[in-house]
């Protein structure tokens, strides 16, 4: 293609004034006219965008790399244009093009960390916003059961915090490198519980156990991260080695935090957990946040379910992680109906690190490695993928990589077996200079990223197949990684995280779990100063913040939002707060499309009621309230024995008497799970809603019936005369004839929504799951 005449003139003028400063590259966003005629002359939009870059680069400098290696993004929806690495001279050339609308430096504008609070809209709408209405969570105390805390982190600074609530009964327990002065008005309490762990892990039996603080001080970083997410103070200029720069805040920055260290290097023991819950109740916390759990177990064997029943009775809201065993069906844990079970979703913040193959093809990846500021981080090198044998070389296990083959090369490492950052450590030890983490079929397109020890990026399964095909078909395959910094708002979000545990619950199938999802992927939050950002022993870098992913990260988001609602409505029960969160949750992403689970719309067993929306939850209109005694009746309907119920509720009850007094009982849960046993064609449930909005409100029902099911609601209108009034309705689920007599179990989903007749935007929605059983 011949150079355009106007480009040649500008190139000549700029060449005469070129300097080393002008030749320094930075990222620019080039916006093009959307209806350009020249676009039609190119095979693809990518080629059209690339043509501008090729013309700009021509003659300005001696270019050793292909212009395509500079192209970071090709846009077509938000704007027509592209983002690229350009010198000042090249950017000036593009500004003179009649087809270019604007050329803008890639400034960081209002990029927030943890950005999730902005993604959730907590900082918006002035005096009517969630933070304003809830006074930032002031007066509430959030108990965090985790690995401890790093009290010197700026996220726990107490500047501007109010006095410690008078009701607080806790202490700041002294221990190794932790004194009573480590606490303040933000971090008001800290305790540690090690006895169960200690007796199970004696030094004689575990001589290689890592050294850790015998105190509430965090040795691993997990607890510091979750505690700052739930209620960390504002920290300006927060970033991870330059990425994600902005102001860090927890969900409830005005709330007080109490830390209970129950997890150690070898795990979290039930005895220690139960002891912490026991003390937290005495300490008078308002919210308990538990980013821990295991596999599904019956409620009567579940220490967390048992311990938190009492907490619920005392008015404490309990929030638990759903678990990271997704996308396996029925992997969800922490399913007691008196706790909120939280799955994980994504944010619309990306950290692009694109792989450019020597043949010019680009494979999208992500990384928090600070490639922009490190010399040779993006140089082109040979790529190798080591397979075969029984050493686990494809997974890049330590000691599995042959040094003579790896030295000086970029290594492809499959996900699985060991940690993502550990793979990079293994590559670096073997002499490799860069790494491409390749998702397998299990991981699909999951994009959990890390602050790697060497230049590295993570690519999805689709891209990994293309990469391996290129390597296998090329004599000397080469590639480079192009690090693109932080990008906001250019991707669909939220989506369900691949690792987020799925329902239905094996232990408790009559309750739909998880309850909801919240941000849990690539969350930036506080980090201890005794660890590098990867948490690996040989990582000598030190940061105040790092990135983590998991339902451990989504759990504290909801814990903090729960504290906000409790601060706004201190007399609400835990069930009412949970109802407000669930019935206002989002089913659609920021583009107005159904939230995705992989390549399909997310179902109720992936997202429960949907993605948490605190802006709506602060004004839910109606709530489904549940009294502690209702849970006991519910357990009776499950057929639990007297001893089972006693173990869970600490109440010695007669289910025969309870069921006689409550015929046809159904728990007043905000979601609806219906199970048709073999031979049954009709099921009926009852629900009660309480008006917490305006007096003289009228709500009309709207039903999206599950496929093959007829749904009848009576009454169809609820007329509330005053606030706090409670009204009941019944719902019949009738199996249509075509679905009767089936030989296999089947599933359908729908939703039931009460719409405020005076405010159509106020919708109180309950997800519906219907299961047809054959035995």
UniProtKB/Swiss-Prot annotation:
Keyword terms: Apoplast, Cell membrane, Glycoprotein, Hydrolase, Membrane, Protease, Secreted, Serine protease, Signal
- Would you indicate the residue range of the signal peptide? 1-20
Q: How does it sit in the membrane?
A: Peripheral membrane protein
Q: Name one Pfam family in it.
A: Inhibitor_I9
Q: Listed GO cellular component terms? A: apoplast; external side of plasma membrane
What phenotype has been reported when the gene encoding this protein is knocked out? Increased stomatal density and formation of clustered stomata by enhanced stomatal development initiation and extension of stomatal cell lineages. No major impact on photosynthesis, except 30% higher CO2 assimilation rates in low-light-adapted plants exposed to high light intensities.
User: What's its EC?
Assistant: 3.4.21.-
Please name the top-level EC class of this enzyme.
hydrolase
Q: In which tissues is it expressed?
A: Mostly expressed in leaves and cotyledons (especially in epidermal cells), and, to a lower extent, in floral buds, stems, and siliques. Strongly expressed in stomatal precursor cells (meristemoids and guard mother cells).
The Gene Ontology biological process terms listed for this entry are: proteolysis; regulation of cell population proliferation; stomatal complex morphogenesis
Coiled coil (residue ranges) = none
Q: Does the keyword rRNA processing apply?
A: no
Residue ranges of domain Inhibitor I9 in the record: 27-111
This entry's comment on induction and repression of expression is: Negatively feedback controlled by components of an SDD1-dependent signaling pathway. Repressed by GTL1.
Residues at the catalytic site:
146 (charge relay system), 222 (charge relay system), 552 (charge relay system)
Primary location recorded for the protein, binned into one broad class = secreted
Localization = Secreted, Extracellular space, Apoplast; Cell membrane
PA domain boundaries: 388-470
Which residues are noted as glycosylation sites? Answer: 472, 544, 652
Query: What family, per the record?
Result: Belongs to the peptidase S8 family.
Q: Main role?
A: Serine protease involved in the negative regulation of stomatal density and distribution. Not active on EPFL6 (AC Q1PEY6). Positive regulator of water use efficiency (WUE).
What is the protein's name according to its record? Answer: Subtilisin-like protease SBT1.2
Source organism of this protein record: Arabidopsis thaliana
State which gene encodes it.
Answer: SBT1.2
